[in-house]
From Swiss-Prot:
It catalyses: Na(+)(in) = Na(+)(out). The gene is SCN11A. Belongs to the sodium channel (TC 1.A.1.10) family. Nav1.9/SCN11A subfamily. It is linked to Neuropathy, hereditary sensory and autonomic, 7: A form of hereditary sensory and autonomic neuropathy, a genetically and clinically heterogeneous group of disorders characterized by degeneration of dorsal root and autonomic ganglion cells, and by sensory and/or autonomic abnormalities. HSAN7 is characterized by congenital inability to experience pain resulting in self-mutilations, slow-healing wounds, and multiple painless fractures. mild muscle weakness, delayed motor development, slightly reduced motor and sensory nerve conduction velocities, hyperhidrosis and gastrointestinal dysfunction. Episodic pain syndrome, familial, 3: An autosomal dominant neurologic disorder characterized by paroxysmal pain mainly affecting the distal lower extremities and occasionally the upper body, especially the joints of fingers and arms. The pain is exacerbated with fatigue. This is Sodium channel protein type 11 subunit alpha. It is a multi-pass membrane protein.
Length: 1791
């Protein structure tokens, strides 16, 4: 039998054969035979070997098709069932759970053979399930010991004894495995499994730490013990899959990491050169001189108000930097314990990494701007937008793409399983028929087919349309490709076995004379298969059959007919949509009641809320009881929502009973009330979707969550073990010096115990790592470098990889639920929607009745105006003519009328309507009486038929007359209006600027008949009916003048100059707003000028509006959204001109004036349109987030309201709770009791607090206040309420991670949907054709360039050869890297010797690069300046020379610009390294994605700037007089436009918005109402919250969406077989073979040229026969054109595809247009024909030589015979018969 075929498998015990010495001998024999076959020459064409079977993979469970394992063979060596291992020295072992283990049959450790008793015992132990459970239990207990054991006592005896025990267990486990498997040499040995490497390292380190007399520190070594937690991953195979996916994503991240590191290095160098030594500028007292020890001279430094921090200053600020008695000087102190600075490359790099991760970057931003000047903001803009937004989101893009690739594999796998399912179904059907024919009982198979292979059960294999990384199959979560134990029981594996079994049980096996035993085994096989299928089916059922019977017996109440009647009535009522609507209204009102709770409620109000709670609880309990009665408990509890409702109702009932009986409420029970809010999800699809996403993600992300928990656990324990002793809750004296009872030296964030260490790691995952790292470094002393390593590792591994995969999965979950929700929404509506539909239908009925009455009245009013002519003729006039006429009419008549004769038959109109078209229509739809106006004349009956449009298959209705009116005076296209006398409301304006509605596509020809560019009607159609005075005839005086005026206005407003002028005025008026800052009051002349310009601008806008009214008409003007926006802004501008006190507040709204730019600038218009398309979805998600957050708000109010107060003294320090315990003591002791500005006193405040927590800004103060809170109006105590941490952790996971990422999901999803609507140009091409098309598109734009000619001068030629060589480039790039390293070595206050060395090095580099420039100019001559890179190099060299000269000047004060700018010039040299990018394909893809994104990002940037501009103007109007406090100071404020923009740029990333809001949230008590400093907290909150939502959540997420989209596009392009660079390199090689750029090379040079090309275009030698296949066309002189060669080589790389010839012809035509040179040369032969000619010539030559040899040897007579004989070689050739020589027949001339 062929080795590749599967053996016949019958499910009985004979499958399991013990592994004996005979088995080993048989394997050795097979291996020897295989080796012989390999040596044999006959077997060189190797037969493909079988692959390992997935269902028999190690660690999977053995499929039940193989039968039960004999008890005596459990744990014993068996012959391998997988044919793949037939020729491998291996055996398999099965345990009781049928798990497969494989071992090598060679000697373990060179001693123990496969039959050794010690090894057999080790094998039995290692495969036993109890052994695995014991090891997992040990790992868990060990983790608990590590987590609970405090770091302070890590060397205690108890801990050491426990560690010895655990180490002993791990050593025992390793020894057992080594004895069973061998160590490393053989297959399946111990160290061949990478997971065992981890065990070895942990054990090795543990042993080393116990060696006596060892001198190294034990603590870092023992910290490695924590990695034992990873053993859980090695035991649970599902976790291995997730870790594998993570590792794959890390592989893909390599390019991003390299690019990020490179960019960070560049930014760090620029920052170092710009800001070196600037952050140590402080205000020092003029009395203090020579401060050597800053700590001793603390009094010499000026401090910030109410802060212990030193005041920073900048020399650029002059005298205003410090107070009068202080001056600005350099010191030895940098901010944040000296860790924030740019003094050397290391600290600068750390600062840039902090900027990129956006952790407290606003502090660095404020410090740098204060010390170096406001121009530094441009540096931060570049780093934030390029470094932070782009590079960080590239990480997300790469992880998302890696995940989507996995998705595609999953989809393919599911599709394959589905196909296999169908095949198995068919095979089993055939098998059943075959077995029945042989007399096997049909009943054994009937159940299999009927119970299992049904369409319903097919769903168990997963829905292939649903692409999810984790398959949600029947409520069970299973990752694809999983190696888990449960996976092998899934049906796909069964089906694989089924298929194989069916093949083995084919009819051939069961002939009449077959073995009866074989027939019995076949029956056994099918029966076991049936049983297995049934077991699988039962495993999917919700409960056992006995449970189902009991439930149907006792939980379905059908007592008596009367009871059934009651049930029927109740079911009708309870399932009615109105009942559901009533319950939903109750839920909403109940939610409002819950949200109304607040601090300091009045007794009556509280009583009302309690009564309300009782009422709603009663309603919900009654609903539950009635539904249970109506539906029976059996059916009621089968729905998830009903179970949820019943739980909430019963908990509420328990809470009420507890209050009634015990007169007090339990917080635990009361908090469950808020779950009622989630009942809204039943009737609100979006909320339902969100809950589904969270549910699916929590389930589907189970494995990932476990991995994340393990990672957090490991880092928490590592932090606790390494830093727990020093970095604990008590601050060290150098950080805190308690001078009194008000100063606390306790810290909330530390690593002193596991819980707090976990919180620190969680905080790092939230994005805040730098502050804890500073404190850790300060406390750890010698281990400070370890702090940096650990904290950055947590940031990179945790935040950038794991959380990004989490987000990627969540986004995919969102898009899937969104699509599924849309499909379900189309299919069925919720009951609330059905109830609302009833109301809508009732309202529509009332409205239509009223409209009908109005139209009836209108028609009565208009009837006298219509005159009828006797004779029963139809209406006919010179103004109204029939649209459809008989074909028999002459063409002249038709031309006169100007109407086409034919109308498409597709018009969907009733046959009894008459369609009329007026030639010239009035400005409204009223028809005028009189001879000259429209008259209705009745046509004779026969002719009337010609005017009617007939439509088949329509039932005739009552006679109606309709007319189609074409507005001949519309602006662009005609208005086609159907007038139905019965239904005037159906008048439809078909074509307008705002909307286009095609009436049955048949009127596509109408616009061609209509004059263009004319105004539309002034008033809406139908207006003249109600107001006859507005009816005008524009053909009669004086309305002709009005019509001409309108046409003139129309031409004006449509003129490009008018639009340009308006844009100019908008820009000027917006610019004027900039000057209205806080200093305007002191500048009356500027104020007067601004008032004048404001009046002028307002009048210009009014004039523009009036012109547009006249030109467009009111109908068109007010139906355009952009025009409405302009109108609102003009009205606001007009109100500002009126000097009324009441209207003064409207002046602020002038800030909206720049919005007019939106309608004028196309780039922003595109972005806004995309944004408007997403607004409904964004608002929906925003509303869902608000509801979701409401639950946490209500809980927050319940837990923390009134508890955020504290007692402070005169210096704003909190007094210790042991001195003052409550508010009354505080006030009696003449202290101040203040409440924190952001608190949980009511739901509104709670929303603000949660927004700060969700954006991680200002959240520390809120968490501190919460965890320190005791009771209402009690003094806070340090961490008295530690459970408060849990509240915030849960909110961050569900309220921040889930809900805020939904914004990204919504925007990306909408963005993709709009892309699909706009795209689709490639939908008619196959994938192969797309590839070919892309390649052709790239090469079509290329053509050969003429290379730079080598100089004739020998010296110049030598230099030319040097500078054009690759080695020269490598040397120069190496020097650039060395120059970069030398710049990195610079530092602030470096030793003079070091400074001298670096200066000299700089001179050396300047000289080298100058020489390089001169040498290249000498060698390349004028061609040097034709290359962009050369020009860049030249400019850099010139600037370097200038900067180096200026830096040598002693007196640099007179230079008009800062000398630091010249330092930056040197950095431009680094830009030359970008040449290397060409070699790095992955990085090139990333940069290409950036280049593709730039246009879109520029538009988004413009929109963001516009939003910032408007908010800056609003901020200047509202907050210009806020006193300096918290984040508001002399630089960052809203006093001027520049300072406002600085603040808004900062908070566009949500950074520090809490500190800017804080000064504006003054309480009424601390605010003087007469002061201008008082502001409404509501306005300030709305201002900042709206800006955060618009900029941070929407615009910045659009930025992310663009990057993701373009990264995907760039990746697709980079994955194309041929890229731009391949074509560039082709032409570079071409230049060497075609120096004159003729576009042709000789055929003889083709072989060398093809071999010289790099892959994939290269055709390696020998390649002549491959050219034959290509059939290349040649022109005269045996030349080939470059395009022909490139086409042929491209087709060879891409392979064959349909339609390539037509595409090639199209691309060649384009190339011809671009390169007319090829037209001059027509091909005369091809390479194939030329080769045939060459072979023919060679044969002739050979024959001729043969003939000549015979001539010389033979005599003359023989020679005559040869010449004249009929079969002479020469004669044969002359006859043209070359077939005997292997050449195609052709004519050979012998003349």
């Amino acid at each position: 039998m062929d080795d590749r075929c599967y053996p016949v498998i019958f499910p009985d015990e004979r499958n399991f054969r013990p592994f004996t010495s005979d088995s080993l001998a048989a394997i050795e024999k097979r291996i020897a035979i295989q080796k012989e076959k390999k040596k044999s020459k006959d077997q060189t064409g190797e037969v493909p070997q079988p692959r390992p079977q997935l269902d028999l993979k190690a660690s999977r469970k053995l499929p039940k098709l193989y039968g039960d394992i004999p008890r005596e063979l459990i744990g014993k060596p068996l012959e391998d069932l997988d044919p793949f291992y037939r020729n491998h020295k291996t055996f398999m072992v099965l345990n009781r759970k049928r798990t497969i283990y494989r071992f090598s049959a060679k000697h373990a450790l060179f001693i123990f053979g496969p039959f050794n008793s010690i090894r057999s015992l080790a094998i039995r132990v290692s495969v036993h399930s109890l052994f695995s459970m014991f090891i997992i239990g040990t790992v868990i207990i060990n983790c608990v010991f590590m987590a609970t054991g405090p770091a302070k006592n890590s060397n205690s005896n108890n801990t050491d004894i426990a560690e010895c025990v655990f180490t002993g267990i791990y050593i025992f486990e390793a020894l057992i495995k080594i004895l069973a498997r061998g160590f490393i040499l053989d297959e399946f040995s111990f160290l061949r499994d990478p997971w065992n490497w981890l065990d070895s390292i942990v054990i090795g380190i543990a042993i080393v730490s116990y060696i006596p007399g060892i001198t190294i520190k034990l603590l870092p070594l023992r910290t490695f013990r924590v990695f034992r937690a990873l053993k859980a991953i090695s035991v649970v195979s599902r976790l291995k899959v997730i870790v594998g996916a993570l590792l794959r994503s890390v592989k893909k991240l390599v390019n991003v990491i390299i690019l990020t590191f490179f960019c960070l290095s560049i930014f760090a160098l620029v920052g170092q050169q710009l800001f070196m030594g600037s952050l140590n500028l402080k205000c020092i007292s003029r009395d203090c001189k020579n401060i050597s020890n800053p700590e001793a001279y603390d009094h010499c430094f000026e401090k910030k108000e109410n802060s212990p921090e030193f005041k920073m200053c900048g020399i650029w600020m002059g005298n205003s930097a410090c107070s009068i008695q202080y001056e600005c000087k350099h010191t030895k102190i940098n901010p944040d314990y000296n860790y924030t600075n740019f003094d050397n490359f290391g600290w600068s790099f750390l600062a840039m990494f902090r900027l990129m991760t956006q952790d407290s970057w606003e502090k660095l931003y404020q410090q740098t701007l204060r010390t170096t000047g406001l121009y530094s903001v441009f540096f931060f803009i570049v780093v934030i937008f390029l470094g932070s937004f782009y590079l960080i989101n590239l990480t997300l893009a790469v992880v998302t793409m890696a995940y989507e690739e996995q998705n595609k594999n999953v989809a393919a796998e599911i599709e394959a399983k589905e196909k296999m399912f169908q095949e198995a179904q068919q095979l089993l059907k055939e098998e059943k028929e075959a077995l029945v024919a042989m007399g096997i009982d049909r009943s054994s198979l009937t159940s299999l087919e009927t119970s299992y292979f049904t369409p319903k059960k097919r769903k168990l294999f997963g829905n292939k349309k649903r692409k999810s990384f984790f398959l949600r199959e029947s409520g069970k979560d299973q990752p694809p490709g999983s190696d888990s134990d449960e996976d092998c029981q899934k049906k796909p594996q069964l089906l694989e076995q089924t298929k194989r079994l069916s093949q083995n049980l084919s009819l051939d096996h069961f002939d009449e004379h077959g073995d009866p035993l074989q027939r019995q085994r076949a029956l056994s096989a099918v029966s076991i298969l049936t049983i297995t299928m049934k077991e699988q089916e039962k495993s999917q059922e919700p409960c056992l059959p006995c449970g189902e019977n009991l439930a149907s017996k006792y939980l379905v109440w059908n007592c008596c007919p009367q009871w059934l009647c009651v049930k029927k009535v109740l079911r009708t009522v309870m399932t009615d949509p109105f009942t559901e609507l009533a319950i939903t209204i109750c839920i909403i009102i109940n939610t409002v009641f819950l949200a109304m709770e607040h601090h300091k409620m009045e007794a009556s109000f509280e009583k009302m809320l309690n009564i309300g709670n009782l009422v709603f609880t009663s309603i919900f309990i009654a609903e539950m009881c009635l539904k249970i009665i109506a539906l029976d408990p059996y059916h009621y509890f089968r729905r998830g929502w009903n179970i949820f409702d019943s739980i909430v109702a019963l908990l509420s009932f328990a809470d009420v009973m507890n209050c009634v009986l015990q007169k007090r409420s339990w917080p635990f029970l009361r908090s469950f009330r808020v779950l009622r809010v989630f009942k809204l999800a039943k009737s609100w699809p979006t909320l339902n979707t969100l809950i589904k996403i969270i549910g699916n993600s929590v389930g589907a992300l189970g494995s990932l969550t476990v991995v994340l928990v393990i990672v957090i656990f490991i880092f928490s324990v590592v932090g606790m073990q390494l830093f727990g002793r020093s970095f604990n809750s008590q601050k060290s004296p150098k950080l805190c010096n308690p001078t009194g009872p008000t100063v606390s030296c306790l810290r909330h964030w530390h690593m002193g115990d596991f819980w707090h260490s976990f919180l620190v790691v969680f905080r790092i995952l939230c994005g805040e790592w730098i502050e804890n790292m500073w404190e850790c470094m300060q406390e750890a002393n010698a281990s400070s470098s370890l702090c940096v390593i650990v904290f950055i590792l947590i940031t990179v591994i945790g935040k950038l990889v794991v959380l990004n995969l989490f987000i990627a999965l969540l986004l995919n979950s969102f898009s899937n639920e969104e699509r599924n929700g849309n499909l379900e929404g189309e299919a069925r509506k919720t009951k609330v929607q059905l109830a609302l539909d009833r109301f809508r239908r009732a309202f529509c009925f009332v409205r239509h009745t009223l409209e009908h009455f109005c139209h009836k009245w209108c028609r009565k009013q208009n009837l006298p105006q219509q005159k009828e002519v006797a004779g029963g003729c139809a209406a006919q006039s010179k103004d109204i003519i029939p649209l459809v006429m008989e074909m028999k009419r002459g063409s002249e008549t038709q031309e006169e009328l100007g109407i086409l004769t034919s109308v498409p038959k597709t018009l969907g109109v009733r046959h009894d309507w008459t369609w009329l078209a007026p030639l010239a229509e009035e400005e409204d739809d009223v028809e005028f009486s009189g001879e000259d106006n429209a008259q209705r004349i009745t046509q004779p009956e026969p002719e009337q038929q010609a005017y009617e449009l007939h439509q088949e298959n329509k039932k005739p209705t009552s006679q109606r007359v309709q007319s189609v009116e074409i507005d001949m005076f519309s602006e662009d296209e005609p208005h086609l209006t159907i007038q139905d006398p019965r239904k005037k409301s159906d008048v439809t304006s078909i074509l307008s600027e705002c909307s286009t509605i095609d009436l049955q596509d048949g009127f596509g020809w109408l616009p061609e008949m209509v004059p263009k560019k004319q105004p539309e009607r002034c008033l809406p159609k139908g207006f003249g009916c109600c107001f006859p005075c507005c009816s005008v005839d524009k053909r009669k005086p004086p309305w002709v003048i009005w019509w001409n005026l309108r046409k003139t206005c129309y031409q004006i407003v449509k003129h490009s100059w008018f639009e340009s002028f308006i844009i100019f005025v908008i820009l000027l008026s917006s610019g004027a707003l900039i000057f209205e800052d806080v200093h305007l009051e002191n500048q009356p002349k500027i104020q007067e000028l601004l008032n004048c310009t404001d009046i002028i601008f307002t009048h210009i806008f009014i004039l523009e509006m009036v012109l547009k009214w006249v030109a467009f008409g009111f109908g068109k003007y007010f139906t355009s959204a952009w025009c409405c926006l302009d109108f609102i802004i003009v009205i606001v501008s007009v109100t500002t001109l009126i000097n009324l006190m009441e209207l003064k507040s409207f002046r602020t709204l002038r800030a909206l004036r720049p919005l007019r730019a939106l309608s004028q600038f196309e780039g922003m218009k595109v972005v806004v349109n995309a944004l408007i398309g997403a607004i409904p979805a964004i608002l929906n998600v925003l509303l869902v987030c608000l509801i979701f957050w409401l639950v946490f708000c209500i809980l927050g109010v319940y837990f923390f309201s009134g508890k955020f107060g504290k007692c402070i003294n005169g210096t704003d320090s909190v007094i210790n709770y042991t001195i003052i315990t409550n508010k009354s003591q505080c006030e009696s002791g003449n202290f101040s009791w203040i409440n924190q500005k952001v608190n949980f006193d009511n739901v509104g405040n709670a929303y603000l607090a949660l927004l700060q927590v969700a954006t991680f800004k200002g959240w520390m103060d809120i968490i501190y206040a919460a965890v320190d809170s005791t009771e209402k109006e009690q003094q806070p105590e340090f961490e008295s309420n530690s459970l408060g941490y849990i509240y915030f952790v849960v909110f961050i996971i569900f309220g921040s991670f889930f809900t805020l990422n939904l914004f990204i999901g919504v925007i990306i999803d909408n963005f993709n949907q709009q892309q699909k609507k706009l795209g689709g140009q490639d939908i008619f091409m196959t994938e192969e054709q797309k590839k070919y098309y892309n390649a052709m598109k790239k090469l079509g734009s290329k053509k050969p360039q003429k290379p730079i000619p080598r100089p004739l001068n020998k010296c110049q030629g030598l230099v030319f050869d040097i500078v054009t060589s690759q080695i020269f480039d490598i040397i120069i790039i190496s020097l650039i890297i060395l120059n970069m390293i030398s710049m990195m070595a610079e530092s602030y206050n470096q030793p003079k010797a070091m400074k001298s060395i670096l200066d000299h090095l700089n001179w050396v580099f300047v000289v080298i690069f100058t020489l390089e420039c001169l040498i290249k100019i000498f060698a390349l001559r004028q061609y040097y300046f034709t290359n962009g890179w050369n020009l860049f190099d030249c400019v850099v060299v010139l600037l370097s020379i200038v900067s180096t000269m200026i830096s040598t000047l002693e007196n640099q004060e007179h230079i008009p610009f800062p000398p630091t700018l010249f330092r930056i010039v040197r950095l431009a040299r680094i830009g030359r390294i970008l040449r290397l990018v060409r070699a790095a394909r992955g990085i090139r893809t990333l940069l290409f994605a950036l280049m593709m994104s730039l246009p879109s990002l520029f538009n988004i940037g413009l929109l963001l700037f516009l939003i910032m501009f408007i908010y800056a103007i609003l901020g200047m109007n509202w907050f210009s007089k806020v006193n300096p406090e918290s984040g508001i100071d002399d630089i960052f404020n809203f006093k001027t436009f520049a300072s406002s923009m600085l603040c808004l740029f900062q908070i566009s990333t949500s950074a520090g918005w809490d500190s800017l809001l804080s000064p504006m949230l003054r309480s009424k008590e601390s605010c003087n109402s007469s002061s201008e400093n008082c502001h409404l907290p509501g306005i300030a909150t709305s201002y900042f919250v709206s800006y955060i939502i618009i900029s941070f959540l929407i615009v910045v997420n659009m930025y992310i969406a663009v990057i993701l989209e373009n990264f995907n596009t760039a990746t697709e392009e980079s994955e194309d077989p041929l890229g731009e660079d391949d074509f560039d390199i082709f032409y570079e090689v071409w230049e060497k073979f075609d120096p004159e750029a003729t576009q042709f090379i000789k055929y003889s040079a083709l072989s060398d040229f093809a071999d010289a090309l790099p892959e994939p275009l290269r055709v390696a030698k020998p390649n002549k026969y491959q050219f034959l296949v290509m059939d290349l066309p040649m022109v005269s002189e045996d030349r080939l054109h470059c395009m022909d060669i490139l086409f042929a080589f491209t087709a060879r790389v891409l392979g064959g595809s349909d339609g390539l010839d037509s595409m090639k012809a199209m691309m060649e035509e384009k190339f011809m247009e671009a390169n007319p040179l090829k037209k001059l040369y027509e091909p005369i032969v091809t390479t194939t024909k030329r080769k045939e000619e060459e072979r023919g010539a060679a044969i002739i030559q050979k024959a001729f030589r043969k003939y000549m040899m015979k001539v010389t040897k033979g005599d003359q007579g023989d020679q005559n015979d040869l010449e004249n004989g009929p079969h002479s070689p020469l004669q044969t050739l002359c006859n043209g018969d070359l077939s005997s020589f292997g050449v195609a027949k052709g004519k050979v001339h012998c003349d």
